[in-house]
Amino acid sequence: MVDERLKQAFLVLLRQGLWGKKEVEQTDFPLTPDEWTQIYEMAVKQTVQGIIYDGISFLPKEQQPPRGLLIQWTVAIDQLERMNRRQNKLLGILPQIFGQEPAIPFQLLKGQGIAAFYPKPMHRLCGDIDLYFGNETQTEKANQRIESLGVRVERGQLGDSSYALNGIEIEHHKRLIDLYRPSVRKAVDCWEAEQFAKRTLVPSPIANHLLQSTHILKHLLLQGIGLRQFCDLAVTLKAQVAGIDRQELEEICRTWKIGKWQQVIYALIVQYLGFPEEELPMKTHENPAPLMEEVWQTGNFGHGDERFGNRPDGFWKGKAHTLRVMLNKWRLSFRYAPQEISWYLTDLARKRIKELFTHESN
């Protein structure tokens, strides 16, 4: 368990790296060598090691990490920069592939498009490349275009697909927004079609914002979330908030019933990441502490969550363990998006009952 003082020191470094400026108060420093090791481990867990590294540069030299750890960190950042350069190079090739006649329009989601908003874009940890093709038909055409190059494409159950190109994972998506309950999906589909028809290389500011916020909700529900996703949300919103129609955003949040979720993530980026409250697209009075505690516990994709131990062997034991983990996530998620969670649980129960009957028959 990380103590509160170390969390506050971590957040100071994170804010300094995120916004590229020194904080006035740095009362939690200096740190001991062991505490610096914990800071590094926390950064890896939250996948913000590049941002924390940048934040360290604003500390006096005598307060920076021990030389050995700093060298290790610098090597990791050098590798991160190399990864980003590889991705940027591949991004220059993709328009050539999909631009061949008949052209297949796409939008770049998240990733390198978001990195451009950071003070040091090359220090954002890059994942896979996400491409959005507007609908299922166009996504399948894109899949076939890639297969024509001799590349194997894996198709998922929800209509998404993935493959590796030049050693980099790429995903194709037929949808932009991660909301799935039938009562709003038709409205979301129509809105997505309107957005995609604008034929921009990246989503519009409001589409980008809603993509990120609903994607974070999905990760909270299914896996776990790290601070990197909130950093992405904060720097993107800071750069694009002037292009967001606040009345349109509020209407969408009412229709999709995600207003409370939007408000709690706004509260989180203000209280912990230093986003200027006066620049929020809507006011918030939500308490972000429970959500932030979940972020501390789970880390990126939930890989750092140690609360429930490893999944045990055996079909039923494994299912029971998964249920314990998911119930914890659902309780928290239900506070912020009850309609989405209720539908998800109903749909999941239907699928699991079918799965159990299949298991028993085998």
Regions found by a protein language model. Give the residues of each.
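Conserved NTP-donor binding/palm subdomain of two-metal-ion nucleotidyltransferases/polymerases, i.e.
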Residues: M1-G127, F133-N362
